[in-house]
Amino acid sequence: MREILHIQGGQCGNQIGAKFWEVICDEHGVDNTGKYNGDSDLQLERINVYYNEASGGRYVPRAVLMDLEPGTMDSVRSGPFGQIFRPDNFVFGQSGAGNNWAKGHYTEGAELIDSVLDVVRKEAENCDCLQGFQVCHSLGGGTGSGMGTLLISKIREEYPDRMMLTFSVFPSPKVSDTVVEPYNATLSVHQLVENADECMVLDNEALYDICFRTLKLATPTFGDLNHLISATMSGVTCCLRFPGQLNSDLRKLAVNLIPFPRLHFFMVGFAPLTSRGSQQYRALTVPELTQQMWDAKNMMCAADPRHGRYLTACAMFRGKMSTKEVDEQMINVQNKNSSYFVEWIPNNVKSSVCDIPPKGLKMASTFIGNSTSIQEMFRRVSEQFTAMFRRKAFLHWYTGEGMDEMEFTEAESDMNDLVAEYQQYQDATADDEYEEGEEEEEEAA
């Protein structure tokens, strides 16, 4: 019932995805051979959201793994949970996308896409009532961004009424892996605006800061960063996998978070923040969780919610707690910080409560916010894009794969439109509407 099909693409996506499955297996008591050895019936009650039950009582993730080069897949396969995946669900090429969006989207990726779609179809047919897809990828490289968005648009064509949720790692402001990141990211956002329902925006730099400042890790590795992401990913779907008092699913989430269809880029946070291996020893209270969850330092993308306003937000609590207390805390947050919420959407914070906490914690919470301040990220990428595109730097790598300059111009203006839309709603007040009507009448006169 209500299955979610997980897809991971490119190096970043596969590494995040591998971590995610470690967390999910742990929560459901599935070991790295797919055998169940948990201690509670609740772990099995809705295990089929993320797993197929195979012969011999093994649980196999509903996961499709794709990449344009074999390297990362090999390391996933030889990793701790590598043997749990279905071998047919690894789909990879040999050539690599070389950080080139056009290779991922038009040439190399397009050659591989049909084999990926075959696997997706096969997995979807195994589902009772498929709820939607979750895609892990980065927007800075070639495969996750180019081929990832190609796959998303193909799935959109074939399953138009299913939810499409992405976990997208944006290029960081200061830490850059490749020079052409702004190109790849802008071309990807252009696709995500059209074809995804909900995008959880992540950012390595913000994750580094959390590891460094809050978790006091001197030299955070990608493993530590992905550990944070996977905690959030697990939190977003816990309501589907465990019984709860206030449930939410991907569609309820979308209905409550997206006031305008294009504005579906969310910042995410998690509390309590703990480093790998060391769980905090003091039990947290709901007010403490709430405070940490809304803290700007806790956001996993490099945008500061204090620079904008929340259109909507959603708080998912896990553990044994009173729903009344949760509701009081949420109302409390809105009352104390009312200037940070748009006043023309009353009660714009939704909360849900799931009874089962993550492994090793008494209670935890996941935060998803639709804040206008996310425009900072788009704006930053857009500036870098324009700086290079003005000089047509590196463009030949893309046109050589059959792309047209027009596409770049379109993607650029789409990104700028998105920024303008966020700005427009940030500035809007509750009584704007009728004034606009009057102005139009005056102009007509």
From Swiss-Prot:
GO terms for molecular function: GTP binding; GTPase activity; metal ion binding; structural constituent of cytoskeleton. Residues 429-445 have a biased composition (Acidic residues). Residues 420-445 are annotated as: Disordered. Tubulin is the major constituent of microtubules, a cylinder consisting of laterally associated linear protofilaments composed of alpha- and beta-tubulin heterodimers. Microtubules grow by the addition of GTP-tubulin dimers to the microtubule end, where a stabilizing cap forms. Below the cap, tubulin dimers are in GDP-bound state, owing to GTPase activity of alpha-tubulin. Belongs to the tubulin family. Dimer of alpha and beta chains. A typical microtubule is a hollow water-filled tube with an outer diameter of 25 nm and an inner diameter of 15 nM. Alpha-beta heterodimers associate head-to-tail to form protofilaments running lengthwise along the microtubule wall with the beta-tubulin subunit facing the microtubule plus end conferring a structural polarity. Microtubules usually have 13 protofilaments but different protofilament numbers can be found in some organisms and specialized cells. GO terms for biological process: cell growth; microtubule cytoskeleton organization; mitotic cell cycle; response to ethylene; seed trichome elongation. Its cofactor is Mg(2+). Mg(2+) binds at residue 69. Keywords: Cytoplasm, Cytoskeleton, GTP-binding, Magnesium, Metal-binding, Microtubule, Nucleotide-binding. PANTHER family: TUBULIN. This is Tubulin beta-5 chain. SMART domains: Tubulin, Tubulin_C. One of its GO terms (cellular component) is cytoplasm. GTP binds at residues 11, 69, 138, 142-144, 204, 226. Disulfide bonds: none annotated. It is found in: Cytoplasm, Cytoskeleton.
